[in-house]
Regions:
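Membrane-interface alpha helices of multi-pass inner-membrane proteins
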Residues: 132-160
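Transmembrane alpha-helical segments of multipass membrane enzymes and assembly factors
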Residues: 66-80, 88, 100, 354
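Membrane-interface micro-motifs in multi-pass membrane enzymes
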Residues: 38, 83-121, 148, 281-301, ...
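Intrinsically disordered, polar/acidic, low-complexity terminal segments
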Residues: 1-35, 39-65, 74-77, 173-177, ...
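Transmembrane catalytic cores of multi-pass membrane glycosyltransferases
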Residues: 4-54, 100, 149-298, 327
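Membrane-interfacial loop-to-transmembrane alpha-helix junctions, especially the N-terminal start
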Residues: 74-82, 129-134, 173-180, 257-269, ...
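Membrane-interface transmembrane helices that cradle and orient dolichyl/undecaprenyl
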Residues: 113-132, 169
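Signature aromatic-anchored transmembrane alpha helix within multi-pass, membrane-resident enzymes
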Residues: 134-135, 261-271, 306-321, 352-377
Length: 445
């Protein structure tokens, strides 16, 4: 909570913070909560953007719940998991944790999606349930469908598959899975009846996003998304996660669980090539071939270690279902790949678990986590100090039409750090109630 208190507000935070939670008219509800169909995400964004303390409290609770749920249901090394989250690509960390609006959509949706998944696992084996359980799983499924589009669509696919498999195996329906499916359908309808999605279907660009309308543009979008979006965010930029995957395969080889040294060596080489390609910006077509070979090698090693183990392949199903909708929408942001990032971590710990290999939470892991936390705390305290100084300086110079302010000390840890842009000025003034004609410029230091 201490760390999240010092997360600076971004332009979007000022926009949402200027909204009131006391909706007095249907029009206000439509314009604010129903702005883009993300009812729950928009509500949380408005709620946390009024105050640093409120934001810190909500961020802390949600992140703690995610870690608790995963630690409760999976055999993980808690401290390795936390390290992998803290050291995810900086842009992704900034977009899903520090940026209030990004947190409200992508961290909240991760919590809800993981909750839905564990509820599916629980109630797949339990057809009977009490009335309050039915209400609870319906609400969770409904809320999960009111945050992020690809997760809504992905959850629909997952629940359809689980309901179908259950029916084929048992020649009857599972009422709990049906209730969750209905809740997800209702949530999807509430989300996608928004005019912006209908406009997207008919070719209108909304917030720089579009759906291709012809076979040529569809092919171009799929190509760009695969080459320069999905594979880059899933493979090339996840340097630490790639290192963890290498460690898992190597550790299992040393334990005698993985016996294919050729497959392991080729995976080492392909991992190095994908990382170098991401760092040095290799030709995207060459990278596409490398990434495809990487994935083939990766799934080959997974198969060698797990064969057709249900626990492994259902996580792979989850990853595919939440990523598949992203193939057809352009552009893609790093924040969309936070949930797949978490699912891959879970997958690798499951590979260890089914091979009866446990990584202990050594003291040095705890010390390293503490050092990381202190460093991140320092970075965000410095940015918070810059924010406070900036706000006080602007408040004392409102008589000027052009105000020069300092930028953040660590701008990579602030989303949309464009103080001299129109976007910042408009919503900053709206948030504070200042004259919207004031212009802001970065001071040359």
């Amino acid at each position: 909570m201490l760390l999240s208190f010092f997360f600076p507000f971004s332009c979007d935070d000022f926009y949402w913070g200027s909204k009131s939670l006391s909706f007095s008219t249907i029009k206000e509800i439509y314009n604010d909560l129903f702005l883009n169909g993300r009812w729950l995400g928009n509500f949380v964004a408005i709620f946390i953007s009024h105050n640093h303390l409120i934001k810190a409290l909500v961020v802390s609770i949600v992140i703690t719940l995610i870690i608790y749920l995963i630690d409760k249901h999976e055999k993980i090394s808690l401290w390795i998991f936390i390290i992998l989250i803290l050291l995810m690509p900086v842009n992704r960390f900034t977009q899903v944790i520090i940026w209030g609006s990004g947190f409200s959509n992508y961290m909240i949706s991760t919590l809800l999606f993981i909750s839905v998944y564990y509820l599916i696992k629980k109630y797949y084996k339990k057809n009977n349930s009490k009335w309050y359980e039915k209400i609870g799983i319906f609400i969770v499924a409904l809320l999960n469908s009111l945050v992020v589009e690809n997760i809504t669509v992905g959850t629909l696919m997952i629940l359809f598959i689980y309901n179908l498999i259950y029916f084929i195996k048992n020649k009857k329906v599972n009422i709990n899975l049906i209730i969750m499916f209905i809740g997800t359908i209702i949530g999807a309808v509430i989300m996608f009846i928004h005019p912006c999605y209908l406009n997207l279907i008919f070719g209108t660009t909304i917030n720089d996003r579009y759906i291709p309308q012809s076979s040529s543009t569809l092919f171009s979008t799929i190509k760009n998304n695969l080459f320069d979006g999905i594979f880059v965010n899933l493979i090339n930029e996840n340097i630490l996660l790639n290192g963890f995957i290498l460690f898992v395969f190597s550790y299992l080889y040393l334990k005698g669980k993985l016996k294919n040294i050729t497959g392991l060596i080729s995976f080492y080489l392909l991992t190095v090539m994908t990382i170098l390609g991401g760092l040095l910006k290799f030709n995207i077509y060459n990278m596409f071939v490398t990434d495809i070979l990487y994935l083939i090698n990766y799934f080959y090693l997974i198969y060698k270690l797990a064969r057709f183990n249900k626990e492994i392949w259902e996580i792979i199903l989850l990853i595919i279902c939440v990523i598949l909708p992203l193939v057809f929408i352009h552009p893609l942001g790093e924040r969309l790949f936070f949930l797949p990032y978490v699912l891959v971590i879970i997958l690798m710990f499951r590979v260890l678990s089914i091979n009866e290999v446990v990584i202990k939470d050594y003291v040095w892991l705890k010390i390293f986590t503490l050092i990381l936390y202190v460093l991140l705390l320092y970075v965000n305290i410095e940015n918070y100090r810059c924010e406070v100084k900036r706000d006080n300086y602007i408040k004392n110079n409102l008589d000027k039409k052009i105000i020069e302010v300092n930028g953040y000390k660590y701008p990579k840890y602030v989303w949309f750090d464009k103080i001299d842009g129109e976007y910042f000025g408009r919503y900053y003034d709206l948030y504070h109630g200042y004259d919207e004609k004031i212009r802001y410029e970065i001071r040359n230091e």
